[in-house]
From Swiss-Prot:
Hemocyanins are copper-containing oxygen carriers occurring freely dissolved in the hemolymph of many mollusks and arthropods. GO terms for cellular component: extracellular region. This is Hemocyanin subunit 1. The lineage of its organism: Eukaryota, Metazoa, Ecdysozoa, Arthropoda, Crustacea. Keywords: Copper, Oxygen transport, Secreted, Transport. Belongs to the tyrosinase family. Hemocyanin subfamily.
């Protein structure tokens, strides 16, 4: 998802 999404924040 988007890097701005809390769910994907760790995947930035």
């Amino acid at each position: 998802x988007d890097p701005a999404s809390v769910s994907d924040a760790x995947k930035q």
